[in-house]
Amino acid sequence: MSGPVTGGCQCGAVRFSAQALGRASICHCRMCQKAFGGFYGPLVTAHGLAWTRGRPARYASSNLVSRGFCAACGTPLTYEYDGGTELAIGALDDPERAAPVIQVNPADKLSFVDRLHALPWRQPGESPAADAFMAAVENHQHPDHDTPTWPPAKGMHP
């Protein structure tokens, strides 16, 4: 996971670059579940982190950890502790560069997580209403690459 990486929040107000990534993990602790609004927290150690647009707001989720997030759109961005910073894998422009290699805090893992892969997929055509809704969705989030300015001119979303 070496080489420079970039990423940022959903609205584009906060952007970062890291010189390299370290270990990627899935954390099942209850604090990560709440911070990510999901079943677990996907995180990767960042080396040489720099904020290239804006800066995250922070919340002290415990006596040892602060979590960075975009104050404008709420995107979770960091897990910060004495000695290191981990980035939210989903905030990377290319999350495929940070495939998790370990899971931590198994005592808090939700009981159904190991069965998610077996859930059925809704295929195109099975729900015309859902297909129509998805076709009408217009993406307003920041693209997965650095931009010189953001947001773009009114009406010029990606």
Model-derived regions, located:
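A short Gly-Trp-Pro
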Residues: 1-8, 13-158
